[in-house]
């Protein structure tokens, strides 16, 4: 894996896809000027943040590609080793009930590009429900080291095909909660083998959701 680091960049996803040659490429930056989140949401820079993207050829993936957002989120949460750092299906990273990061997966021709955005420190978040992992700024070297370890962890899971949904679910806040999705509400029951969310509607019907447009209610 090749790594390139920036103090600021337009967009790590676009740069990673543009610069990809053959080996997996990791781009990491402390800030983005034109970042984007899931569903084309704008990227908001915290006082100290990490924006990183890992791009690789699809041919190295020999398991269900819809698991990649789950794998990417779990890879970060597992390396930080803070019991209050959790996952919300399918792509949010939560700390003490505040959203501190998220995952964005995009495909471009033969490439898969995984983006990760994390708020390390944010004294006064200007977004409802947003937060940061740390109460003070961290050494920039730690942030870039976290990015590299995150990238290597993902590639190791892909190479060895040993990503565990049980481990993922141990960090998940969503199961057992009432969730709202575009067509209604239901109770989150399980994560299927393809990474989709199984919910039970008030009428008892079981549905499998793949859309990230859900919100936890209770």
Spell out what each predicted region is:
Residues 1, 21-29, 86-89, 151-154, ...:
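N-terminal start-of-chain detector that recognizes signal peptides
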Residues 60-87, 95-218:
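Long, positively charged amphipathic alpha-helical accessory segments at protein N-termini or as interdomain linkers
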Residues 1-78:
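N-terminal lobe of the biotin/lipoate ligase/transferase fold
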């Amino acid at each position: 894996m090749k790594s390139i680091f920036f103090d600021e960049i337009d967009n790590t996803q676009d740069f990673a896809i543009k610069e990809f040659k053959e080996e997996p490429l990791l781009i990491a930056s402390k800030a983005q000027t034109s970042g984007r989140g899931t569903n084309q949401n704008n990227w908001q820079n915290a006082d100290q943040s990490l924006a990183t993207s890992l791009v690789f050829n699809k041919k190295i993936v020999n398991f269900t590609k819809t698991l990649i957002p789950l794998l990417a989120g779990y890879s970060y949460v597992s390396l930080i080793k803070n019991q209050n750092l959790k996952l919300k299906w399918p792509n949010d990273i939560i700390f003490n009930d505040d959203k501190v990061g998220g995952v964005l997966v995009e495909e471009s021709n033969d490439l898969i590009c995984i983006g990760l955005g994390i708020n390390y420190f944010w004294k006064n978040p200007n977004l409802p429900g947003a937060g940061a992992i740390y109460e003070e700024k961290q050494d920039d070297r730690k942030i870039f080291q976290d990015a590299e370890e995150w990238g290597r962890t993902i590639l190791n899971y892909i190479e060895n095909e040993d990503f565990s949904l049980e481990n993922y679910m141990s960090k998940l806040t969503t199961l057992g909660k009432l969730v709202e999705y575009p067509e209604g509400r239901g109770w989150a029951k399980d994560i299927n083998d393809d990474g989709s969310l199984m919910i039970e509607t008030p009428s008892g019907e079981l549905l499998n959701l793949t859309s990230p447009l859900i919100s936890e209610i209770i």
